[in-house]
Regions:
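Alpha-helix capping and helix-coil boundary motifs
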Residues: 1, 8, 97, 132, ...
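Solvent-exposed, charged interface segments at domain starts and junctions
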Residues: 1-4, 138, 145-146, 151, ...
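N-terminal zymogen propeptides
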Residues: 1-43, 50-52
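Short, structured coil/loop segments at alpha-helix boundaries
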Residues: 7, 17-18, 79, 188-191
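Subtilisin-like serine protease catalytic core
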Residues: 30, 36-167, 199-205, 209, ...
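A solvent-exposed, charged loop/short amphipathic helix patch at secondary-structure junctions
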Residues: 156-189
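Conserved N-terminal glycine/acidic-rich loop preference
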Residues: 186, 215-220
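Catalytic-core regions built around general acid/base machinery
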Residues: 189-200
């Protein structure tokens, strides 16, 4: 059957577009993968206006601030842009390009000025995305005030090599529909956990991506 066929899918891999995927759970027979998301936020929000000499006149750098990130793997702590400001809080075994990229967007010091992060003198706590909700709660208790989560569940159609060949794969519930996935915007268990966490830790801000899924799918 379809579920048995999907049980042969890979549990974790990176596709041709450098997106990282990992099987997180199985929900009513549907495989639920996390996928990394990218954005051009630093350019769009004009962070440089807040720097010393910037148009806003604030001279902000992120100094004395701790930020958090959860992502697909270990941050490359040895990167020239990070110095000693990054702490990997878990035992993530393998460096991940996406995690390192997002941390660079957040806190790269500007050794290469084109790579300068939005909070270029901030410190950062990094964790891999498994067990994120519990780790976030503990980090909030430890005083973390802001964290970035540039990932989400695979929904609808996605192109990749889950089944051994690079092709479009359907991750909606085929018993409900084969061309429309109710999980887009669905207020599920994970979203509820994060809402409860945010309510119980009012000084902790969770920043999460909305995904890159719009328009995905094979030609009609």
């Amino acid at each position: 059957n379809l579920f048995a066929k999907k049980m042969e899918y890979k549990s974790a891999f990176t596709n041709e577009a450098n997106e990282s995927f990992e099987l997180i759970s199985i929900d009513d027979g549907t495989l639920r993968y996390f996928v990394t998301n990218n954005a051009t936020g630093a350019t769009l929000i004009k962070t440089s206006d807040l720097y010393s000499g910037g148009a806003a006149g604030f001279a902000l750098s992120g100094d004395c601030t701790i930020l958090g990130i959860w992502d697909a793997g270990r941050v490359r702590l040895e990167h020239q842009e990070f110095g000693t400001r990054i702490t990997q809080r878990d035992n993530a075994p393998t460096n991940n390009n996406h995690a390192t990229h997002v941390v660079g967007t957040m806190v790269a010091s500007g050794v290469n000025n084109a790579a300068k992060g939005m909070s270029h003198q901030a410190s950062l706590w990094a964790s891999e995305w498994n067990n994120d909700s519990a780790e976030m709660a503990n980090a909030a208790i430890d005083g973390l005030e802001v964290s970035q989560h540039s990932y989400g569940y695979v929904t609808g159609w996605h192109f990749g090599n889950w089944s051994g060949q690079s092709a479009w794969h359907w991750f909606g519930d085929p018993y409900i529909a084969d061309n429309e996935d109710y999980n887009f915007g669905f207020y599920g268990e994970s979203a509820q956990e994060w809402d409860i966490l945010a309510y119980n830790a009012p000084d902790y801000l969770i920043s999460s991506s909305a995904g890159n899924d719009r328009g995905n799918g094979p030609s009609p």
